Amino acid sequence: SKKIFLKKFFRYLFNFLFIIYLSLFCYFFFIFSNLSYLKIILYTVLFGCIASDIGGYVFGKIFKGPKITKISPNKTFSGALGSIIFTCLVVSSSLFFFTNNFSQLVIILSVIISLSCQIGDLFFSFLKRKAKIKDTGTFFPGHGGILDRMDGILLGIPFGLISIIILH
């Protein structure tokens, strides 16, 4: 039937586009990590993505509060705020350490990194819920699997790097 065809078509289209996105992500990550002057920027954005995930988890566990969405029921507003705060601390400290300079643009960059990581996390949580996958592993206790750790990074790094280009 037409409905089944469309469902399969969009599933294959999504998989195809995701493979292209992941390939481009890996390609640009490789390019950035091989250029020494861009390596600091790349790793600062990566540390910001990791900080976003950790800050959200820790603040959410400590302060709890209202839930953000049903897509990912453990996400709270306190976790979202903690994610932004911790990302700001890590990114500004990292850039100050490497450049001995601080700019207000670092705060804007940090907020963009954190929000894009949170959106990426929610987006992939939505996809996993649709596919009826709860966790993608237990490598990080309380954090889900490796893919759960990568959810935010897959959106955070590209948005972080694009933001640096625009803000610079």
Specify the residue positions occupied by each region the protein language model found.
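Hydrophobic transmembrane alpha-helices of multi-pass small-molecule transporters
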Residues: 87-88, 156, 165
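Hydrophobic cores of alpha-helical transmembrane segments in multi-pass inner/ER membrane proteins
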Residues: 23-26, 156-161
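Juxtamembrane boundary at the C-terminal end of a transmembrane helix
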Residues: 162-168
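Juxtamembrane/interface motifs at transmembrane-helix termini
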Residues: 78-79, 91, 146-147, 161-162
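Membrane-embedded alpha-helical bundles of polytopic integral membrane proteins
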Residues: 1-76, 80-115
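Acidic (Asp/Glu-rich) catalytic motifs at the cytosolic membrane interface
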Residues: 49-65, 77-78, 115-155
